[in-house]
């Protein structure tokens, strides 16, 4: 999809997408935006107002009205924004996606989008609209047969022009917003396609090859450690999980460094990279659950997607992207329940459940990240079903002992529209991981499972500010919603990018 900028007025278009606010105040009635009301009176003889009244369109959130009309605008989509005082960037994204889905239903190819005065930061609003446009248009047909000549496939909208009041006065700011949106969307789409691909396509070596390609395309440093190199570093927890698979484990370390000048911050992003999780000898017995275990590398996908976006945006921040990639399989070499592993920080772990393997791989990845001397570490993992039970399928759980980092990530999530909710690191719960034969077990009691999982990870970070995002819920969507299509969501990419960019901005202003 092509994105362009333009200035009002809206005079001619194949398809126009117009935002409408709901009436506010007692006894207030809905009225069309002025530019559409004028065209309706002069050109359309009141057809739009009549249709809005008949369809009871009132500009409410999640509402829309799609019409075919005589020129100069042949297709018109009205989308509701609701109460202007309650408008958020995420509501604007969702309304944009809703409108573009309607434009698709009208088979529109070129859409002109008239951005009103939203009361929000207008540059941020342009970025939000552009993100939604690019993400809703993404359709993953890689594994389908080519369409027949008469078969329509893909999103019809090919070009979106954003009409922005006052464009000339701040054109470069708006162009920068489009670039940020474009790169964030590209990173999100990379993450979506990694998660959506089956485990016979996205293997540990395939993830490593993706990292190598990113390094080649964007000038990143890349280090891929195999089994022997990981053994030399004492990564017994990671390798214990990997030992049953016929595919080699791959420890991926990508680094972005600014081309000129010293970095203003040094950060690490760590992603869980289980390309398939059978559960090991504690095998997953639910067929639906095991079929979805191709998604267990959603954290790795988010980290690689963020690498793609940040390498293109070029912040003055050094960022390390770390993934311990493997499968969790069953074979004669498989990890047994009761086995004891030694992580690279010397701590020993009694494995009382081989299906709690992600935290074992993350343990060595977190130790590796801290040794880099970074200012902060954020890990993302499809870690626990308990977090999905607690927060549902749209919200990630945030765990951190660091108040500043918690606030930073919440602010980044507010900007991206990716929902997070902070959960407690209740230290007394760590008693549930106590072992009589090792320093700790890898799982505790059923209750508080997402908390004990986070407390387990905490044992592998000594002093560096650290946060853990449990993304087991939002990594996958069971239906179209807003700018997210059914399937892999690419969750986490935009929040990570916003966090890194905010760190850069904070350093520049201090």
From Swiss-Prot:
Q: How is the cofactor bound?
A: Binds 2 manganese ions per subunit.
Spell out the InterPro entries in the cross-references: Leucine_aapep/pepB, Macro_dom-like, Peptidase_M17_C, Peptidase_M17_leu_NH2_pept, Peptidase_M17_N
Q: Which GO terms describe its biological process?
A: proteolysis
- Which residues does the entry assign to the active site, renumbered to this chain? 284, 359
Query: Which reaction does this chain catalyze?
Result: Release of an N-terminal amino acid, Xaa-|-Yaa-, in which Xaa is preferably Leu, but may be other amino acids including Pro although not Arg or Lys, and Yaa may be Pro. Amino acid amides and methyl esters are also readily hydrolyzed, but rates on arylamides are exceedingly low; Release of an N-terminal amino acid, preferentially leucine, but not glutamic or aspartic acids
Indicate yes or no for the key word Metal-binding: yes
Q: Could you list the residue ranges forming a coiled coil in this record?
A: none
What does the UniProt keyword field contain? Answer: Aminopeptidase, Cytoplasm, Hydrolase, Manganese, Metal-binding, Protease
UniProt GO molecular function: manganese ion binding; metalloaminopeptidase activity
Q: Which Pfam families does this one have?
A: Peptidase_M17, Peptidase_M17_N
Report the enzyme's class at the first EC level.
hydrolase
Give a GO cellular-component term.
Answer: cytoplasm
Report the principal subcellular site. Answer: cytoplasm
Q: What Gene3D superfamilies has UniProt attached to this entry?
A: Leucine Aminopeptidase, subunit E, domain 1, Zn peptidases
Say if the entry is tagged with keyword Protease: yes
Any idea which positions bind Mn(2+) 1?
277, 355, 357
| Function, as annotated | Presumably involved in the processing and regular turnover of intracellular proteins. Catalyzes the removal of unsubstituted N-terminal amino acids from various peptides.
Q: State the PANTHER family in the record.
A: CYTOSOL AMINOPEPTIDASE, LEUCINE AMINOPEPTIDASE-RELATED
Q: Which family does it belong to?
A: Belongs to the peptidase M17 family.
Q: What is this protein called?
A: Probable cytosol aminopeptidase
Species of the source: Synechococcus sp. (strain JA-3-3Ab)
